């Protein structure tokens, strides 16, 4: 998906659109935790390793991203906290019973 996004970003810049291409790594979830555990590493250590590999690969492929962000970045965490607080304050987050597929 990053290569496709890069293609779109390059095209958008070529036709004169103001373009900001953000990419990065999602470092949360059970898969990351399990992969770290099987390697005898902490989740953060494993995320650091994998994120570094992705960033190096994107640089090698000359991906034209403007910013590489990780879900473990302090900046990202702060942004998520602000967004969730706004949703909570508006009443968009609440406890209830849910019926559905997920």
Regions found by a protein language model. Give the residues of each.
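N-terminal, positively charged nucleic-acid-binding surface of large information/translation enzymes
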Residues: 1-102
């Amino acid at each position: 998906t990053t290569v496709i996004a890069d293609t779109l970003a390059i095209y958008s810049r070529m036709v004169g659109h103001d373009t900001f291409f953000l990419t990065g790594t999602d470092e949360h979830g059970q898969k990351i935790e399990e992969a770290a555990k099987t390697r005898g590493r902490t989740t953060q250590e494993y995320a650091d390793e994998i994120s570094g590999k992705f960033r190096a690969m994107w640089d090698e492929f000359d991906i034209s991203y403007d910013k590489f962000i990780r879900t473990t970045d302090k900046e990202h965490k702060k942004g998520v906290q602000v967004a969730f607080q706004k949703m909570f304050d508006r009443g968009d987050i609440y406890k209830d019973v849910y019926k559905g597929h997920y």
